[in-house]
């Protein structure tokens, strides 16, 4: 009975998170209340509070859940025989990220999360400081770590210059991905998403390589 109760609790928690994501993306974080979230699920506001002590706690849980989901999607794109990002090269990681971008734009929850993060939260507000810091420093998100490790691998193998900062390159690469995916979701990108990502990563790769002639990142 206890196990059944735990499953029901987790199921309800996930329903609340899904409802919150939909409403946050459509109405905005500030304009959405616990009453709105509860009404959409035919629940009481108190029931929502039982799972999340505040709207901020709910948002943090939602961000964590979505980052974990994106991380699982990236892990599923690992080359056959690989179980981690540790031994991957930059071109391989770049290819994984391009394919993941194609997955994201076809995923309703993924697109809703992007709209929420980019358009429906006032990050400058003081109340958002803790969440903003957690999101910006959350290196659990697989792509950042994958790009960093790939650059470090390149430096060790001699294919990447020794003066290159792996963390800096990782930040640039994730920012490219984030910006182009959001532009595609917002219908403002006037070129092919996958082709543009590949060419962008190819440019980054060429800028950090030690040799003059190297295979493109594809």
Residue ranges and their predicted role:
Residues 75, 88, 92, 112, ...:
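Amphipathic alpha-helical packing segments from all-alpha helical-bundle domains
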Residues 3, 7, 11, 53, ...:
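Residues at secondary-structure transition points
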Residues 55, 62, 66, 70, ...:
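Hydrophobic/aromatic residues within well-ordered alpha-helical segments
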Residues 61, 75-112, 166-173, 213-218:
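Hydrophobic alpha-helical connector segments
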Residues 104-134, 182:
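Amphipathic alpha-helical segments used for helix-helix packing
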Residues 103-107, 123-124, 144, 149, ...:
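Amphipathic C-terminal alpha-helical segment
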Residues 4, 11, 15, 19-65:
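Helix-turn-helix
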């Amino acid at each position: 009975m206890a196990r059944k109760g735990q499953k029901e609790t987790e199921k309800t928690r996930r329903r609340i998170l899904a409802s919150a994501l939909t409403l946050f993306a459509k109405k905005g974080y500030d304009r959405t209340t616990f009453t709105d979230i509860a009404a959409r699920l035919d629940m009481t506001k108190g029931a929502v509070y039982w799972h999340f002590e505040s709207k901020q706690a709910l948002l943090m849980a939602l961000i964590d859940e979505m980052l974990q989901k994106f991380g699982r999607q990236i892990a599923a794109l690992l080359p056959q025989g690989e179980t981690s990002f540790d031994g991957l090269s930059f071109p391989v990681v770049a290819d994984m990220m391009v394919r993941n971008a194609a997955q994201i734009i076809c995923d309703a929850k993924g697109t809703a999360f992007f709209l929420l993060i980019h358009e429906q939260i006032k990050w400058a507000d003081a109340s958002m400081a803790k969440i903003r810091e957690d999101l910006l420093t959350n290196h659990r998100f697989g792509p950042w770590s994958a790009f960093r490790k790939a650059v470090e691998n390149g430096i060790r193998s001699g294919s990447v210059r020794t003066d290159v900062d792996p963390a800096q390159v990782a930040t640039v690469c994730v920012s490219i991905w984030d910006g182009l995916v959001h532009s595609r979701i917002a219908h403002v990108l006037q070129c092919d998403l996958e082709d543009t990502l590949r060419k962008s990563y190819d440019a980054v790769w060429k800028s950090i390589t030690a040799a003059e002639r190297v295979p493109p990142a594809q």
